[in-house]
Amino acid sequence: CIPGYLIGDLWEQQTFLDDCQYYAEKLVEASQDICIMFGNVAFEKDKLNEDGRLRKYNAAVACQNGKVFGGYMGRNFIIKNSLPNYREFDDYRYFYSLQKLCAEEDAVVAEALQPLEITIRDKQIKVGLMICEDGWTENYHLNVPQTLANNGAEILFNLSCSPYSLGKNKKRNKLFGAQAKEAGVPLVYCNNVGIQNNGKNVFTYDGCSSAYNADGTLITSAEMYADTL
């Protein structure tokens, strides 16, 4: 993801948001002959969050050959639905969820969660794109990956910025393997590598990006704390 995640009140600085948008445009320009999917902050200057500040979304973008694929609710980006609000996570402080947007625009979340049609190796594939917590379905009433599969997704991608904790990777493999098996489609989990500071704590991100077959089998996994293609 372009901006990072646990970065505190940097989310409230307009110059930072503008920089994120600038680099997103550069990534879109660079997507010649390849498909790029990345996380970013999206914002709408004509709308406000519930705190009266600029409307921001924890978002993801898919692009190819200089063009952005469609997103949710008429936007050109995917909107995170499941916003964590516990321990170090503070999404509700900064972001507007897909669930809230659907309520605002009188839409149904399960219908808004549609896969993107992306060309990969000259074949049209319906890709279900999720953002981090959207895949941690245990305590949410809406199962985002299953909903995307029900709506036609042939493969699921989870773009994450998930901080390290002891035993977390084992839990990820169990969770995402089960999701792939339940949905009956392959799943790719892509996690951030590096360090971030929210002004109170420093967090490390261990990567360990992984891919799972439709039967839930772990196919491959990247090394911890290593940038990998």
Annotate the PLM regions.
Residues 1-229:
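Enzyme catalytic cores with a strong preference for nitrogen-chemistry domains
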